[in-house]
Amino acid sequence: MAGSVPWAASRRLWGWVPSACRSFSLGVPRLAFVRLTLPPPKVVDRWNEKRALFGVYDNIGILGNFEKHPKELIKGPVWLRGWRGNELQRCVRKKKFVGNRMFIEDLHNLNKRISYLYKHFNRHGKYR
């Protein structure tokens, strides 16, 4: 039949119309998406190292007379302590901090990664 809309498409189109405006029923709603049983509970180790040490330095200011900032207690590379950002920003920051002391091959690989990420962030994503 020319000009007719298939049944499934018409059902989808009527899905946009509120049920109060419809003059007929679309049938019994499907129960395919209704979960009949509860999912099994996840087994979680509540005392792993990360959870056990959570908030351990929260009161460092009170007990330490406010001489140290918690970011000074973080162990890791100097260019990452107390700093947040995406991978491109992290690589640029690493190059700025230790680029002159890196081996040639490592610096070359870092420059390649920065080049790739720069192209990627400019071609993909929400803010391009």
Curated annotation (Swiss-Prot):
Keywords: Mitochondrion, Ribonucleoprotein, Ribosomal protein, Transit peptide
GO biological process: mitochondrial translation; translation
Transit peptide, UniProt annotation: 1-31
Cellular compartments per GO CC: mitochondrial inner membrane; mitochondrial large ribosomal subunit; mitochondrial ribosome; mitochondrion
Self-association state and partner proteins as the record states: Component of the mitochondrial ribosome large subunit (39S) which comprises a 16S rRNA and about 50 distinct proteins. Interacts with OXA1L.
GO MF, one annotated term: structural constituent of ribosome
Keyword Ribosomal protein: yes
Subcellular location, record wording: Mitochondrion
Name the record gives this protein: Large ribosomal subunit protein mL51
One Pfam family from the record: MRP-L51
Keyword Mitochondrion among record annotations: yes
Species this chain originates from: Mus musculus (Mouse)
Database matches in InterPro entries: Ribosomal_mL51
Record-stated family: Belongs to the mitochondrion-specific ribosomal protein mL51 family.
